[in-house]
Amino acid sequence: MSDIKYKRVLLKLSGEALAGDQGKGINPPEILKVAEEIKEVHDLGVQIAIVVGGGNMWRGEAGAEIGMERAQADYIGMLGTVMNALALQDSLESVGVPTRVQTAIEMRQVAEPYIRRKAIRHLEKGRIVIFAAGTGSPYFSTDTTAALRASELNAEVILMAKNGVDGIYNADPKVDPTAKKYTKLTHMDIINKGLRVMDTTASSLSMDNNIALVVFNMNNRGNIKKVVEGEEIGTTVEGK
């Protein structure tokens, strides 16, 4: 463990990371690839908590835009994250990684309810914990969930795994070829520059609790391991 920079991490995975090229739904071969990457890091002795998004299933904001009540639309999105969490748990356990799912909305037949002390105990015992159903409340993103859970668990860093984007830019690099990549930023830089990395609530929570953020490209094999070993890839956000 002497060559590991981060001992306890929170990995934020988008729902799209589990969908692969198809963009929607659950893609088992793609999830298995993600699980194998996570296993590499787990085998180093790193304690790993995961927050999964649900954008491959549903987005609450999109539901609200077509006339649904926003709270109801958000609850549907939370259920989507539970499906993703169960699929990821299955893949992780298939490669020999003990995994627990905890949900912010109780559904005891399929997962444990979120209990902070129990989650920490799982991590200490070498189990991965996947947090699903967001915060359990509408209007809060899974990015905010990641910042909240990282704060509660005393995680050292949030690993923000992105699809095909290798860090934070001053413009969308997929649209603007002149977009400039940042290698280091502070949390206030994120807020003041209006950089769309995570929402303001999540950024403020991370800043107030002194949690670093590393944004990197999930599509490059081995990147999660590189980050926890301290290799400077992507963009690191830390300090006020």
Curated annotation (Swiss-Prot):
UMP binds at residues 54, 74, 135-142. One of its GO terms (cellular component) is cytoplasm. It catalyses: UMP + ATP = UDP + ADP. Keywords: Allosteric enzyme, ATP-binding, Cytoplasm, Kinase, Nucleotide-binding, Pyrimidine biosynthesis, Transferase. Residues 20-25 are annotated as: Involved in allosteric activation by GTP. GO terms for molecular function: ATP binding; UMP kinase activity. It is found in: Cytoplasm. Allosterically activated by GTP. Inhibited by UTP. Pfam families: AA_kinase. ATP binds at residues 12-15, 55, 59, 163, 169, 172. Its EC number is 2.7.4.22. The keyword Endoplasmic reticulum does not apply. Signal peptide: none annotated. It is an enzyme of class 2 (transferase). Pathway: Pyrimidine metabolism; CTP biosynthesis via de novo pathway; UDP from UMP (UMPK route): step 1/1. GO terms for biological process: 'de novo' CTP biosynthetic process; UDP biosynthetic process. Catalyzes the reversible phosphorylation of UMP to UDP. Belongs to the UMP kinase family. PANTHER family: URIDYLATE KINASE, URIDYLATE KINASE PUMPKIN, CHLOROPLASTIC. Homohexamer. This is Uridylate kinase. It comes from Ligilactobacillus salivarius (strain UCC118).
